[in-house]
């Protein structure tokens, strides 16, 4: 049986006494596209931060290629991070650098390659995402879709085995989002990358995913194929798929807040 390229075990995280992730277990297999779904506040971003080693959990482990990233040497962690390409929400391009300078940065900082080789790799990466003519432009001169593509070029500069996207379709119109989805599938097919996508955009999720995992209030409630996920009868999943708002109960807290609002507006009950 294939070993997972990323293995998360009993991951528990709290902030300010509030439990954000509650004993999450997840295996991501080599070469698959795993989409992590969940409403705002479900723990998606927290899980991503721990997956790439930007924070340490209260308990539990995150292993990449068999190495526990919270219990390894600095040298091992650096090697692991070189195998991780991350395209953050909002692209996170350096505004003071041209597009090609953004792509060159990890190559110059993390390799001993010559300038001429770096130039060739930079051009190849930009051409790969359809930005061969945009290298001299500044990030502020790019459209939203072009910024996302430039972020992908930078994330793949070191030829990582794992590519992680944080809300890749955020802020994009449907046509540009579909083009980005096609690029993600192209990366998987041609470069045989393992892709992890954190999103709440269902159209893109079902377009690219091999499997989907769903977080609900800090707990992982489903890890399923697209087909199984779309036909799930779990009410929490159905609510998310059908875009139905949560029903507000008539609790004492809600009633008290309503009375406060009425008083503030000077309206008698």
What are these regions (language model features)?
Residues 163-166:
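Catalytic Walker B motif of ABC-type/P-loop ATPase nucleotide-binding domains
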Residues 69-85, 115, 229-233:
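ABC ATPase NBD coupling module
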Residues 52:
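Helix-to-loop junction immediately C-terminal to a conserved catalytic motif
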Residues 67-68, 115-133:
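Conserved ABC ATPase "signature" region
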Residues 97-105:
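Short coil-to-helix segment of the ABC ATPase nucleotide-binding domain corresponding to the Q-loop/switch region
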Residues 138-142, 146:
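Conserved ABC ATPase signature
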Residues 157-161:
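A short, proline-enriched helix->beta-strand linker immediately N-terminal to the Walker B motif
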């Amino acid at each position: 049986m294939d070993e997972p390229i990323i293995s998360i075990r009993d991951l528990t995280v709290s902030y300010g006494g509030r439990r954000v992730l509650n004993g999450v277990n997840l295996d991501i297999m080599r070469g698959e596209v795993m989409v992590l779904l969940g409403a705002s506040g479900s723990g998606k971003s927290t899980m991503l931060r721990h997956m790439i080693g930007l924070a340490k959990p209260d308990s539990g482990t995150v292993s990449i290629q068999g190495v526990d990233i919270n219990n390894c040497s600095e040298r091992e962690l650096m090697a692991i991070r070189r195998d991780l390409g991350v395209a953050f929400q909002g692209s996170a391009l350096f505004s003071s650098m041209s597009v090609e300078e953004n792509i060159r940065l990890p190559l110059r900082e993390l390799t001993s390659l010559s300038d001429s080789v770096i130039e060739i790799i930079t051009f190849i990466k930009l051409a790969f995402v359809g930005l061969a003519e945009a290298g001299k432009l500044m990030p502020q001169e790019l459209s939203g879709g072009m910024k996302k593509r430039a972020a992908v070029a930078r994330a793949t500069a070191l030829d990582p085995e794992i590519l992680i996207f944080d809300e890749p379709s955020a802020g994009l119109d449907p046509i540009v989002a579909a083009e980005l989805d096609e690029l993600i599938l192209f990366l998987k097919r041609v470069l045989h990358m393992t892709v992890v996508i954190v999103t709440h955009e269902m159209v893109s999720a079902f377009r690219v995913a091999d499997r989907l995992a769903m977080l609900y209030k800090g707990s992982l409630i489903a890890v399923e194929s697209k087909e199984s996920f779309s036909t799930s009868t779990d009410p929490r999943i159905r609510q998310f798929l059908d875009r139905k708002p949560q029903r507000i109960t008539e609790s004492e807290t809600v009633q008290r807040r309503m009375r406060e609002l009425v008083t503030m507006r000077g309206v008698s009950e």
